[in-house]
C-alpha cells in the first residue's frame, strides 16, 4: 500500500474520526468548529476531497452521510514520522531522540517507556 501523506486539514478530520466514528456531517461540523474554528463549508469541502482521495468512507445514514476513516491511525502516523525523520534529521533516529530528549525533560515513566521500546527492538532483557 502506498504511504499516506496527509495535509493539516486532513489530519484535523481524521483525528476527529479516529476518536469517534461514524460521524455525520453535522457532527463533524460541530467537532471541527470547536477544535479548529472551521466553517460548515470548509468541513464539507474537506470531506468531499478526502472521500475522492479515499481517505474517508461515506455511507448513507438517513437523510445524510455518516463518515468513517478509511486510513488507520497507525499507518498515517508511521508515514508522517518517516517523512519528518527523513526531512529534518536525514533519517537519523538517534539524532532526533537526542534533540527531543535535550529539548524537554523526560519523566521517569517516559524514560522507562523508551528503555522498554529499545529492549524490545534489541531483543534484550533490560540488563
Feature roles, as predicted:
Residues 44-48:
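Short, hydrophobic-biased segments on the C-terminal half of alpha helices
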Residues 30-38:
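Short helix-coil junctions and helix-kink-helix linkers
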Residues 58:
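Short beta-strand "wing" residues that participate in macromolecule-binding interfaces
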Residues 78-124:
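Amphipathic alpha-helical dimerization/coiled-coil segments
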Residues 3-9, 61-80:
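Short, cationic-aromatic polyanion-contact patches
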Residues 54:
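Glycine-centered, phosphate/nucleic-acid-interacting loop/turn motifs that mediate DNA/RNA or nucleotide
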Residues 8-16, 27, 95:
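Pre-recognition alpha-helix immediately N-terminal to the DNA-recognition helix
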Residues 23-31:
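Short acidic, hydrophobic short linear motifs in intrinsically disordered regions
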Amino acid at each position: 500500500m502506498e504511504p499516506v501523506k496527509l495535509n493539516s486539514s486532513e489530519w484535523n478530520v481524521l483525528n476527529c474520526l479516529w476518536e469517534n466514528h461514524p460521524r455525520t456531517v453535522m457532527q463533524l461540523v460541530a467537532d471541527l468548529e470547536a477544535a479548529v474554528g472551521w466553517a460548515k463549508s470548509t468541513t464539507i469541502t474537506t470531506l468531499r476531497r478526502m472521500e475522492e482521495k479515499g481517505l474517508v468512507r461515506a455511507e448513507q445514514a438517513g437523510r445524510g452521510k455518516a463518515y468513517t476513516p478509511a486510513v488507520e491511525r497507525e499507518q498515517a502516523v508511521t508515514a508522517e514520522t518517516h517523512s519528518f525523520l527523513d526531512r529534518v534529521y536525514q533519517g537519523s533516529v538517534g539524532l532526533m531522540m537526542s534533540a527531543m530528549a535535550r529539548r524537554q525533560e523526560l519523566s521517569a515513566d517516559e524514560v522507562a517507556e523508551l528503555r522498554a521500546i529499545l529492549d524490545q527492538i534489541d531483543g534484550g532483557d533490560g540488563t
